[in-house]
Swiss-Prot record:
Pathway(s) per entry: Cofactor biosynthesis; ubiquinone biosynthesis
Biological process terms in GO annotation: ubiquinone biosynthetic process
InterPro entries in the record: HB_polyprenyltransferase-like, Prenyltransferase, UbiA_prenyltransferase, UbiA_sf
Enzyme Commission numbers on file: 2.5.1.39
Predominant place of localization: membrane
Protein name: 4-hydroxybenzoate octaprenyltransferase
Organism: Vibrio cholerae serotype O1 (strain ATCC 39315 / El Tor Inaba N16961)
Subcellular compartments: Cell inner membrane
Cofactor(s) essential for the protein: Mg(2+)
Pfam families, per database record: UbiA (PF01040)
Amino acid sequence: MTAVKARAYWQLMRMDRPIGSLLLLWPTLWALLLAAQGLPDLRVLVVFVLGVFLMRSAGCVINDYADRHVDGHVKRTSQRPLPAGLVSAKEALLLFVLLAVSSFLLVLTMNTLTIQLSFIGILLAFVYPFMKRFTHLPQLVLGLAFSWSIPMAWAAQANTLTPQVWVLFLINALWTIAYDTQYAMVDRDDDVKIGIKSTAILFGRWDKRIIGLLQLATLSLLVALGQGLALGTSYYWGLLIAAGLFAYQQHLIRYRERMPCFQAFLNNNYVGMAITAGILLSVW
């Protein structure tokens, strides 16, 4: 394999841009920490951290495969490996299978409940990239896909699923819809031209308000979750920081400009980090 080909595979998996993996990692850590009520089992932690990066990479590959005929028409994606001809469609599919199988082999080291839940996760990861052709709500499907690590991680740590799991699932789904709508705002003009659907297009002039409502709902449910689990003061400091970051994101997207909207999307990494730190300090 040449250096150019290796670099193309690396870029296809977004290993050069790990923001997506980090946004998937934070809620996974929330679930592990809360299920353990402290530090999770080291083996489970290692499996899920590796699994997050493998499945996020698999999701990026199948997403680019699904979009291979349209990415060349979008300014932000025109130089990705598939539209640039650096990786073939067949090679991308083979890479997706390799990554998905590797993730599944990791899951096989977990308990039966986690293994059963993983089949839904794989299905969501495969289906999501194709949704933008059929519905204006692909961000909702992404929210489900990015949140499915929560019941899986909880099941792996506790071997059961409690009602709090599904509250956390809903919290992350709402947050995901909010930040992926910010991401979709970057490409909205191009997407309208080529017929790609998104919540950014669906929400139209209400986009900023709806993102704000989703962020408010996320924080409100996080407060309710903290009260239900009797989490400590550190948790609420984490939520306060997250609230400040959400306010900053609203400032960034106020004019709907491409780069500030993208910066708002990236800023969500710090939201996830703040909440994770709050949970960790509260349960440790």
